[in-house]
């Protein structure tokens, strides 16, 4: 049965992925910068920064492929979690990536910045 909890996004890796390994268990976190489909009042592009994570074989593959400033397509599920930090209850919403596709390998940050026009995505 197909789940209705699914997302798809195309964006730019905006910081190097952080890989963790504990007892043969792999985990990676990264952030994807995506362009909104409208401009700010100053006619500048607006962005969202999606916090993503992946586990296991997907994490290992992402570690090998993802570098800062490459353009990727990702898909997976949205999940929320609750945790305590300094005795304060906090919530986080994260994207659990189960599939990914590098789209354009870039050599310079400017290539990712060229995806700033809302009409391009």
What residue ranges belong to the model's regions?
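Acidic, gly/ser/pro-rich intrinsically disordered tails
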Residues: 1-5, 10, 16-26, 39-45, ...
